[in-house]
C-alpha cells in the first residue's frame, strides 16, 4: 500500500474524531459513516472539493463537541411508492422565459446596482 498524503491523513483523523464525538448522540455515527461513504469515490485529484468537505467536517465536529448538539440527522423528503423523480428538462416541467426572473435582485427588495457602482 502506498504512503498516505497529508490530506488523506487529515481526512482519516477527522473521520475518527467525528465518530468519537458522535458516540452517544442518536444518528451521529450513521450520519458520519454515510457522509464519508458518499464522498469516498471523489478522485484524489479533486483537491479543492476534498479540502472544502474537510473544512465542512471540521465545523460539524466543533458543533458536535459543543454541548448544544444532542443528535445529528438529515433533512430528506421520502418519495412515495409511485412518485417519480422530477426531471427539470422534461417538456412539461420547463420554465418559459416569462416565469424566470430577469434580474437576480428582482423580488428580493434589493436595489439594483449600476455598473458604475452608484
UniProtKB/Swiss-Prot annotation:
GO terms for cellular component: mitochondrial matrix; mitochondrion; nucleoplasm. Plays an essential role in the assembly of succinate dehydrogenase (SDH), an enzyme complex (also referred to as respiratory complex II) that is a component of both the tricarboxylic acid (TCA) cycle and the mitochondrial electron transport chain, and which couples the oxidation of succinate to fumarate with the reduction of ubiquinone (coenzyme Q) to ubiquinol. Promotes maturation of the iron-sulfur protein subunit Sdhb of the SDH catalytic dimer, protecting it from the deleterious effects of oxidants. May act together with SDHAF3. InterPro entries: Complex1_LYR_dom (IPR008011), Complex1_LYR_SDHAF1_LYRM8 (IPR045295), SDHAF1 (IPR052687). Residues 72-118 are annotated as: Disordered. It comes from Rattus norvegicus (Rat). Residues 109-118 have a biased composition (Basic and acidic residues). Belongs to the complex I LYR family. SDHAF1 subfamily. A motif (LYR motif 1) lies at residues 14-16. It is found in: Mitochondrion matrix. This is Succinate dehydrogenase assembly factor 1, mitochondrial. It comes from the Eukaryota. Keywords: Chaperone, Mitochondrion, Repeat. The lineage of its organism: Eukaryota, Metazoa, Chordata, Craniata, Vertebrata. One of its GO terms (biological process) is mitochondrial respiratory chain complex II assembly. Its main location: mitochondrion.
Amino acid at each position: 500500500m502506498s504512503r498516505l498524503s497529508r490530506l488523506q491523513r487529515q481526512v482519516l483523523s477527522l473521520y475518527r474524531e467525528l465518530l468519537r464525538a458522535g458516540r452517544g448522540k442518536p444518528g451521529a455515527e450513521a450520519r458520519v459513516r454515510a457522509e464519508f461513504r458518499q464522498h469516498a469515490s471523489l478522485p484524489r485529484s479533486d483537491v479543492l472539493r476534498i479540502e472544502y468537505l474537510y473544512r465542512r467536517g471540521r465545523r460539524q465536529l466543533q458543533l458536535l463537541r459543543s454541548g448544544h448538539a444532542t443528535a445529528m440527522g438529515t433533512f430528506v423528503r421520502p418519495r412515495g411508492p409511485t412518485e417519480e423523480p422530477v426531471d427539470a428538462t422534461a417538456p412539461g416541467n420547463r420554465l418559459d422565459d416569462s416565469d424566470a426572473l430577469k434580474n437576480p435582485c428582482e423580488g428580493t427588495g434589493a436595489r439594483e446596482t449600476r455598473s458604475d457602482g452608484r
